[in-house]
Amino acid sequence: KLKKNITDKTDKMIEEYEAICADLGLRLKTMSMGELITELEKGLKPKVENIDFIAFSARKIKEMEEAGRGGSAKSYKTTIESLKRFIKRDTLNISEITSGFMEDYEKYLKDRKPLTKRVLGDRAISMYPGYIRALHNLAKKEYNDEELGIIRIPWSPFAKYLVKKPTPAKKRNLPAEVIKKIITLPDGPETNIGLTRANLAKDVFALSFFLIGMNTADLYNCDCISDGRITYQRTKTKNRRSDKAEISVKIEPEAMPLVEKYFDRTRHRVFKFYKSYSSADGFNAAVNRGLKKIGELVGVDDLEFYAARHSWATIARNDLHVNKYVVHEALNHVDDAMKVTDMYLKKDYSQNDDANRRVITYVLTGDDGVKKRGKK
């Protein structure tokens, strides 16, 4: 296989040399060896003006989507749309991406007016240039061949321009009493689409909390419910993990009314959200819009869906002192230091189940289980 790869590259290089010599015509007969080498080097120099960074990025984003990396594709697509607004056109010669260009783009991100009511945070100002750097590196990997001395993209703007480190994300966890307010909030009269969406958002938020922070993409896509458990592969990370990021969550009694309310009777999926929304992104957007109304009712500015997941983890760890590794596992995260050990262990979700039971009881009743354990 290695021999074939070398042969293919050599054949390609010979073809390029032959094409250059053919273009030289009769001049070739009068040239010295040094002059010929100069002409060959000139002919092999990259025509960088033909490398459109926007078109290249669109192709890479499509590859991500086809590989099932929808979340990553969405982030890169948002970045490229921002870049197009900055340059005010749909094409960008890769040679234009210099350290000065990136500094101007960063300033644009800091100064520009947001397209929505939400302010573009420091994390986005860091993330967008970071995604551009990643795409630029992919382009260099594709168009350059250092082994054969073919360098079509010689610039390294990110050697001088350093992507800023993001500021720590704003903590999105809510105290137990606020979570209880959201969960127990009565449905509003569905007199308009806004109130209907708010009721849905409240239910989905509660469902997520009861299911250990299950996110909207997984609530939308999951298709396995059996023996009182929902088993699913986490959409965000399943393509990056050997275990497909699979996890099983016990349906606690408090979650059952919501499971039954949104249950898909056709059994194509666990929940029928896909019948009302054509994509997980559309479903997520509707839930987050509805949560803004719920936030107003419970006194939380800019309430976000992910607060359910963050709050579950914080309450489990800080209020109930659940073992940090159990919280880590319940959130379906991977500990690199434990990867080898995990290969030998059969998955056991009982500790996750116990932690979830304690969290739900604590939020709804205030009972942290300490007295009960002390009596034993």
Regions picked out by a protein language model, each given a short descriptive name:
Residues 82-85, 95, 115-157, 214:
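N-terminal DNA-binding recognition helix of tyrosine site-specific recombinases/integrases
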Residues 224-231, 301-302, 322-345, 366-376:
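Short, polar N-cap/turn motifs at the start of nucleic acid-interacting alpha helices
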Residues 179, 252-301:
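Active-site/catalytic core of tyrosine-dependent DNA strand-transfer enzymes
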Residues 220-261:
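Conserved tyrosine-mediated DNA breakage-rejoining catalytic core shared by Y-recombinases
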Residues 206, 210, 214-217, 309-333:
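C-terminal catalytic core of tyrosine-transesterase DNA break-rejoin enzymes
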